[in-house]
Amino acid sequence: MSELLVYKASAGSGKTFTLAVEYIKLLIFNPRAYRQILAVTFTNKATAEMKERILSQLYGIQIGDKDSEAYLNRIKEETGKTEQEIREAAGIALSYMLHDYSRFRVETIDSFFQSVMRNLARELELSPNLNIELNNTEVLSDAVDSMIEKLGPTSPVLAWLLDYINERIADDKRWNVSDEVKSFGRNIFDEGYIEKGEGLRQRLRNPNTIKEYRKQLKALETEILEQMKGFYDQFEGELDGHALTADDLKNGSRGIGSYFRKLNNGVLSNDIRNATVEKCLEDAKHWATKTSPRYADIINLANSSLIQILEDAEKLRSKNNLLLNSCRLSLQHLNKVQLLANIDEEVRQLNHDNNRFLLSDTNALLHQLVKDGDSSFVFEKIGTNIHNVMIDEFQDTSRMQWGNFKLLLLEGLSQGADSLIVGDVKQSIYRWRNGDWGILNSLNDHIEHFPIRVKTLATNRRSETNVIRFNNRIFTAAANYLNGVYKQQLGKDCEDLQKAYADVVQESPRSTEKGYVKVSFLEPDEEH
């Protein structure tokens, strides 16, 4: 059965070498296989480097160049072909590719999806004269300027803008209206917003939507605070019924009474569960001082009711703290949501008026088409001759991109062709353009019913031994420390973190201990 091969490749581990070997192996079996392979990466520079690497190594293998010996040996080992067979096939493949270069598809993710869009333009009812806009910033700037120009004294947008400005002033932040709104408006290009944008715009067409939602959030906030205040009332009621006060308990006002007072004041954060609370949950003896004249009464009361009240409060406190914070954050940002939806609407209107299509909308449009439509139709337009898919820097792939690629991968796998993914979650740096390392981290044994085989490239050939050893120790320690913090707060290991750093330790091919690492500790200052 065909499989998806996943290479986890840390820095210096031979990722480009491995990709080129896997590509050339397909050509050795079939010199025209390049017509059925799609290799994608993130930058034009990486695309050019990959093309150059494949072509130069094909030539090197053909003529017996020493620089291509490592490629030849790996291909011999993994294909079972003789050296002569590999050299001949490499020469034939190189000749075919040079005379059929347009079908040698190593390209960026963006350029691939653009080509798909061109093939689907008619079905998507996109005008043939449509202007493709590459610069989101310029479009956003025009939209915000247009929105501000339209503001009138009674405009709800003006009220939202004023709220936004007041919030910035309260936080001692810059409040240049135009620049700040443009900066905030970049959120409309985030995939999280794009996926929910249409539903949000539909709901906000009702002018009462935000008002009703605000009312619901306020009611939930009040309900949570009253519920937690109820535990303080129970605690005080039990003490009062036995002629006791919180000062009679162990450590007086600094003891367990402090916990319940915080609940009464609406403080539900995790740090109020301190050592005193832990001890009082464990044993009634921690509720009273041994020298207290009411020692026996307090112990009996703790066993009969106070410990139970504390346990009940703790069962709800953590969950209610999350709900309370969610309510308050939502209330804080409701006006921003309205403002964002208005900016989005203005961008769409300007695009329509100027017969313009944003390049950044490509992924979203294809994602919607693939999700709602007939995938076989999409494959027909893309070109069903793509069998093998190779994706480089996969840790920076976005959810929408993965949704689009996944169907292409599954189509190739169903035809008996293997596909390849290369990435390293520890090097994910493209969150600003919706990259999601969690996709690679969550690829386990199967994709649908097709098996996934994971290989880790563990040898770092780029760095010196001392540098490798330092990195092994520092990142192992850092991952363990963060997992400890996570476990302390949530009571369980952070499985995503553990999985991401399970392969952090690299090996060195060198026996000599060379390399130098210097660590400097910086003191925090007002700016940082």
Where are the regions that the model predicts?
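Conserved SF1/SF2 helicase motif Ia
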Residues: 27-42, 414
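Walker A/P-loop
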Residues: 2-21
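Conserved Walker A/P-loop ATP-binding site and its immediately adjacent core
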Residues: 37-54, 109-110
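Conserved helicase NTPase motor core
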Residues: 4-8, 38-39, 46-47, 105, ...
